[in-house]
Design a protein with these regions (language model features):
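Short helix-capping/linker turns of helical repeat alpha-solenoids
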Residues: 40-43, 54-59, 78-81, 94-96, ...
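Hydrophobic face of amphipathic alpha-helices that form TPR/SEL1-like repeat modules
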Residues: 49-59, 87-94, 123-130, 159-166, ...
């Protein structure tokens, strides 16, 4: 049930200028020569602005010239700009304007991370956690997530909670997991809200309290978290802390299944197979089992195969 957060699409965040000017690429384009003059004279803020303008990954609709972006990022990085250092790391990781190099990416992320950049700390942690161009090092990942978490970053807090929950790179400590989940959940991180709900649901690291579990599941579900939607469905199906209702369970499973969540697809298949909360429909059951099985859900694979044998297929 715990929603293990990951950057599955491999997109590492870059940092953009917080000024209104970066939102007006037309203005920048019209005054480009003047801005370049300021940058050549050593104006660090304009150097970074030009880097963002030329970097299509940061400033959509800008110059889209990775070579120029790298040039200005490097110049301003030498002056200690951590945003530029982080963005250089992303460009090396993706091979934009430079030869792709995970080693150089981690070098720039580390430089920015050591100077306190939360985004760079998370990017460096991400590389070590998933072995993206470097050797997997869960302890190193946990170290950098902790630094970002201690600066109040909700995403890092939620991930650090997961690492404590499973003992990933740190000694397993469910009390510490609950602590970090709570910090992130109170900031609105829906993954942490779901995970905190799991802890209350199961009595892991806290006294079991289904009402509190449901509260956190609902907060996450309102943000579209499919895992939380499934967990609410399971509470209604089993009557944990709520009036038992297979009809309401089906409603929540449908929300999560529509998002492609395999656990909900399997659970919905079970309801259709038994006619519990929905009209019995073996074809619908097989469809949902198949969808879950295609994502590697083992129980669904077994049920799908069983249905095929019953149908003589």
């Amino acid at each position: 049930m715990s929603d293990k957060k990951s950057n599955a699409n491999g997109v590492y965040p870059q940092e953009a200028v917080k000024s209104d000017i970066v939102k007006n690429e037309e203005f920048i384009g019209e005054h480009l020569e003047t801005l370049r003059e300021f940058a050549e004279r050593g104006d660090a803020s304009v150097m970074y602005l030009l880097g963002c303008y030329y970097d299509g990954g940061v400033c959509e609709g800008g110059g889209n010239d990775p070579d120029e972006a790298v040039k200005w990022y490097k110049k301003v990085s030498r002056l200690g700009n951590t945003h530029a250092m982080n963005n250089l790391g992303v460009m090396y990781l993706c091979g934009q304007g430079v030869r792709k190099s995970a080693a150089k990416a981690s070098k720039w992320f580390r430089k920015a991370a050591e100077l306190g950049s939360v985004v760079a700390q998370k990017n460096l942690a991400e590389m070590y956690r998933y072995g993206d161009g470097v050797r997997v090092d869960s302890a190193e990942a946990a170290k950098w997530y902790r630094k970002a978490a201690e600066q109040g970053d909700a995403e890092a807090q939620g991930i650090l909670g997961v690492m404590y929950y499973y003992g990933e790179g740190v000694r397993k400590n469910v009390a510490a997991a609950v602590k970090w989940y709570r910090k992130a959940a109170e900031q609105g991180d829906c993954g942490a809200q779901n995970n905190l709900g799991v802890c209350y649901d199961t009595g892991t690291g806290v006294a079991q309290d289904w009402a509190v579990a449901l509260k956190w599941y609902r907060k996450a579900a309102r943000h579209g978290n499919a895992c939380a939607q499934t967990n609410i469905g399971e509470m209604y199906e089993t009557g944990r802390g709520v009036v038992k209702s297979a009809v309401r369970a089906a409603k929540w499973y449908e929300k999560a299944a529509a998002q492609g969540y395999a656990g909900a697809q399997y659970d919905l298949g079970e309801l259709y197979a038994s006619g519990n909360g929905v009209a019995k429909d073996l074809h619908a059951a097989e469809m949902w089992y198949r969808k879950a099985a295609e994502q590697g859900y083992a129980d669904a694979q077994y049920k799908k195969n069983s249905r095929r044998q019953e149908n003589g297929e």
